[in-house]
Amino acid sequence: MASANQIILTPSLVARVGQHIRTVMGNASSVEAAALCALNGKCVWASDAAFENAAPTIAQIGIMSLRLWVKVRSGKLDRIGLVTAEGAVDIIFVPPIASVLVVSGRDAESSWLDDEPAGLLRALGMPVKG
């Protein structure tokens, strides 16, 4: 059940999300793959088939971590970064569309992510808060 502030992930909306992500990936050479997952962990869009299989597990880790953070701390946490020997994975919560953006790259810092999820919301024509 979506709250009044959440938008349903329709095929049209998912296609627009994919278009935005592909555009910014084209300008960020360090980003190798990206996916959008619903809060139930289901992958609704992925930049490639291999990441489509991996992203739901990564998203679930992020979702569980965000829930744990909310339970034990005050304040807001909207993203998590996982660093491995081969690169980094960023997990970004996108509340208005009840989703998690999962991005894999070679650098621990992916500069286009600094503007996410605000850039994604602007691309969808949605208001950006804060």
Predicted regions and their residues:
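Non-catalytic interaction/Regulatory regions outside core domains
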Residues: 1-39, 43-130
